[in-house]
């Protein structure tokens, strides 16, 4: 039976991958909070293996940390990923040339630009743009849980705990493509 999270994804009109082993459904669920610097979102990784559904659930952030909200990397403001389905845009690579992650190389992603340098996450429709921004999916600390997002995200989707993500589940199947 298809997992409930995939039913919700399908109900929103998005494609759900149901055929084949390790055909990953990577689902980021943003919390309703607009407060920054917290790992208060959820990422589900759902796939089939030998006709059995496998589901993982991890605490993440889908939002930039406070450091980058106050110190944007560019003059247009800090990136916040817009809700949507981004099929085929990630592949296994290195985040900032340092460690294994899913990197945005296969297509554009839509973002909001938060320009006002406060602690509130702004999702202003007038700031929406799409492009290649290096919005990756990666871990925070290598050693422990990170309590705050801080410098771990300038717009990337970041796992709170590196140990929670056995990158075997996330990266081995992606040697093909997500």
Protein language model features and the residues they cover:
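Cell wall/extracellular polymer interaction/catalysis modules
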Residues: 1-150, 164-165
């Amino acid at each position: 039976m298809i997992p409930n999270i995939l039913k919700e994804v399908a109900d929103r009109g998005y494609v759900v991958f149901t055929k084949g082993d390790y055909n990953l459904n990577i689902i980021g669920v943003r919390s309703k909070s607009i407060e920054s610097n917290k790992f208060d979102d959820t990422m589900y990784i759902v796939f089939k293996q030998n006709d059995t559904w496998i589901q993982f659930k991890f605490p993440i952030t889908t939002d930039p940390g406070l450091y980058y909200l106050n110190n944007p990397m560019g003059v247009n403001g800090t990136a916040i990923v817009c809700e949507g389905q981004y099929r085929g845009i990630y592949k296994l690579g290195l985040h900032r040339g340092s460690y294994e992650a899913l990197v945005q190389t296969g297509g554009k992603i839509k973002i909001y630009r938060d320009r006002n340098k406060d602690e509130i996450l702004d999702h202003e429709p007038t700031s929406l743009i799409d492009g290649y921004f290096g919005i990756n999916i990666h871990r925070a600390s290598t050693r422990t849980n990170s309590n705050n997002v801080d410098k771990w995200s300038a717009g990337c989707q970041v796992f709170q705990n590196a140990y929670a993500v056995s990158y075997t589940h996330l990266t081995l199947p992606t040697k093909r493509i997500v």
